[in-house]
Amino acid sequence: MTGFITHCWKSAGFNLRRCCRWLLWAWLMACAPVWAQTSSADMSEFKVERQDGSLLLNVQLKLELGPALEDALVKGLAVHFVADAEVMRDRWYWYDKKLGMVSRYYRLAYQPLTRRWRLNVSSEPIAHSGVTSSLSQNFESLREAIDVIRRQTSWKVADMSDIDLDARQYVAYRFRLDVSQLPRPFQIAAGNQADWRLDIARSLRLTSDMVR
């Protein structure tokens, strides 16, 4: 019985110390001056193509992580990103109709013991631990890991059988840093830091040349 109580006390103490550490780091982040260079996201490529009865999406992001975000990663904070794409059809009499969609979830974390970067990629939300039915890759540098996130190629967003060549349709795309996956103190502090407000949305009108 004594051993059980001791184990619980040690676990509680560890969790308390970890919570205090995150609270302190979040407070320092909120009070820190704005960095001259901040995180940014833009697009250098956004196009679709028809292949084997499917409509495929190709995106090339111009993604840069600011110093505050990189610093948090190096200190052990895992960061989650989400990319969503939907094919929609205009309807003047009701909400636009969704014809297809695709999502990708990314979890980026630094492994201090091996000094390597781990990136998990999945079509489903990734747990905080990163343990899920996801593809896991390890990289020597942060740049290599970010390059994988930047290149989003041959994503199937819809079946061509659902595309009406005579209708008005478009692809809506969004990429963002998922703040909801951060520890609660960081969620509050992130609102004051441009580094943590990574969010880009674009739309592409489908033309007959793209889908024929």
Question: Model features per residue range: what roles?
Answer:
Residues 1-16:
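N-terminal secretory signal peptides that target proteins for export/translocation
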Residues 15-33:
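Bacterial N-terminal signal peptides
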Residues 34-41:
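Boundary at the C-terminal end of the N-terminal hydrophobic targeting segment
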Residues 41-47, 67, 103-105, 154-159:
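Short structured motifs
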Residues 55-65:
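Short, well-ordered beta-strand segments enriched in hydrophobic/aromatic residues
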Residues 58-60, 138-160:
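A beta-strand/beta-hairpin structural motif
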Residues 71-143:
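Structured domain cores in non-transmembrane regions
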Residues 154-212:
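Glycine-rich, aromatic-bearing surface loops/beta-hairpins
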